[in-house]
């Protein structure tokens, strides 16, 4: 980072608000970025918190203009969003004085009408250059681009979201095509600085900068880990998820000759909380506690339960085994499948007592994690499993945790042919013509989530509103079948050829 910008940044965040930073040549354009913020409160260990980010924003604003942006993923998923559908996040962002947001893929977890309601409640602007209603009309109050004067410079902003399996009422077109069009518009509008607010992979961001030299800066999200990368001197920056850090970017110069300085700002207990934002966060947390009811112990676990996606999205996991065992046992199905993206928790559940609140946090998607039961032939079940292991090769949420069967797969083999040998149930191979009763979550089984297509589930899906919640099945299983004590579930269900399962 440039030495002068570094010193200004240090003064901003160490309490020296009254001290003027040393002058920076020309008037700078400054951004404060957060991304993938699913909870407004602090995370485990006391890190993060939008109230602390608001303090940083205020200190920066006291020194000069700063544009505060969110690069997607905030309205879902979380246990609060399961019940309040993102209202708590919008209210916190409003109090924190957010300026701009773009869509992350998880904004589309909400029904479109619900998302439109959240946008209407926002006192900040939503910008998306590639996501619209299915017919191509704009999502209400969402702009494809915007310009804003910052320190005398005309700054153009646009928003991009990665393509994905979204609800049918939403369409997100190819981000690169959308970017080319919107950059043409911003150039014609006379923008001095063009900034992309993106929610896609870092590699997609790099490719975009390499193809489009008129984009000066990308403020991104999606990976959950801080990043500062450059392409021809132009930065791609991302912060850590859940506001455990923010990125502070300073640019000075002029059109075609911008200099850039980037600083990662840890959000920790050393930063005071903004009073107004802290009050909003506390009110929503109190509301959630009342909704969930008294904390009660469901049982105890002799092993830590780790929901880390680095494990569960590529291999069998102990937590996945526990959940699928619960679903299979409590529904009476032959086989239970859970897409790994269902299991979300921002902490490890340690060995010891486990409460109803712990388990509610594990399933933040609400009705999407209801479970339906339906028949599949052995041949169709194998195709479903093939789809799941292909998701595992990519490390996505479509990788399946399973109960009631076992199989081996080889990620080096071609997609659709990665299962090695038989799929086995109860010690014998499942034949193509066998009829298997399968319990599966509503999101993949009924809504096509993660690319699953299961017409066999249509009759069960017609009753999905009354289907049991996975969290209720799990609580019943722990307190009933397990006698309140969780021990290591049987593993070696999903075996990767040549590897030992991490568990």
Feature annotation, model-predicted:
Residues 5-15:
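Bacterial N-terminal signal peptides
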Residues 16-283, 287, 314-326, 336, ...:
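Acidic, metal/ion-coordinating pockets
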Residues 24, 28-30, 39-42, 54-59, ...:
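Catalytic centers of hydrolytic enzymes
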């Amino acid at each position: 980072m440039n030495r002068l910008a570094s010193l200004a940044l240090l003064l901003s965040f160490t309490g020296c608000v009254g001290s003027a930073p040393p002058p920076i040549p020309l008037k700078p354009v400054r951004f404060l970025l957060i991304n993938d913020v699913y909870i407004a409160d602090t995370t485990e260990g006391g890190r993060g918190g939008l109230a602390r980010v608001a303090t940083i924003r205020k200190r920066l604003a006291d020194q000069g203009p700063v544009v505060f942006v969110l690069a997607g993923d905030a309205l879902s998923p979380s246990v609060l969003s399961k019940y309040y559908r993102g209202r708590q996040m919008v209210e916190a962002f409003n109090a924190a004085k957010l300026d701009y947001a773009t869509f992350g893929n998880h904004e589309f977890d909400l029904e479109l009408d619900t998302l439109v309601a959240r946008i209407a409640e926002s006192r900040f602007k939503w910008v998306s250059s590639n996501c619209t209603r299915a017919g191509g009309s704009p999502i209400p109050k969402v702009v494809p681009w915007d310009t804003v004067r910052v320190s005398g410079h005309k700054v153009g902003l646009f928003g991009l979201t990665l393509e994905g399996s979204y609800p049918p009422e939403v369409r997100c077109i190819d981000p690169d095509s959308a970017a080319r069009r919107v950059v043409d518009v911003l150039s014609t509008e006379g923008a001095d600085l063009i900034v992309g607010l993106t929610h896609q992979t870092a590699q997609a961001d790099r490719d975009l900068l390499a193809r489009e030299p008129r984009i000066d800066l990308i403020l991104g999200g999606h990976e959950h880990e801080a990043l500062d990368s450059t392409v021809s001197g132009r930065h791609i920056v991302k912060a850590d998820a859940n506001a455990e850090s923010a990125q502070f970017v300073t640019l000075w110069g002029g059109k075609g000759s911008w200099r850039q300085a980037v600083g990662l700002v840890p959000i920790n207990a050393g930063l005071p909380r903004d009073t107004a934002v802290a009050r909003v966060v506390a009110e929503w947390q109190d509301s959630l506690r009342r909704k969930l009811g008294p904390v009660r112990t469901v049982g105890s676990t002799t092993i830590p339960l780790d929901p880390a996606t680095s494990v569960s999205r590529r291999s069998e996991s102990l937590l996945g085994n526990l959940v699928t065992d619960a679903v299979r046992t409590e529904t009476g199905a032959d086989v239970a499948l859970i897409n790994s993206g269902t299991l979300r928790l921002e902490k490890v559940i340690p060995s010891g007592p486990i409460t109803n609140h712990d388990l509610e946090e594990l399933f933040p998607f609400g009705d999407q994690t209801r479970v339906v039961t339906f028949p599949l032939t052995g041949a169709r079940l194998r195709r479903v499993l093939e789809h799941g292991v292909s998701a595992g090769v990519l490390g996505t949420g479509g990788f399946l945790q399973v109960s009631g069967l076992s199989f081996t797969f080889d990620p080096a083999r071609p997609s659709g042919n990665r299962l090695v040998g038989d799929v086995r149930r109860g010690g014998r191979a499942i034949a193509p013509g066998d009829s298997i009763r399968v319990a599966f979550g509503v999101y993949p089984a009924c809504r096509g989530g993660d690319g699953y297509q299961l017409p066999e589930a249509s009759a069960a899906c017609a009753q999905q509103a009354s289907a049991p919640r996975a969290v209720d099945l799990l609580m019943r299983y722990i307190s009933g079948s397990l006698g309140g004590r969780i021990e290591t579930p049987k593993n070696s269900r999903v075996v990767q050829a040549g590897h030992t399962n991490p568990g």
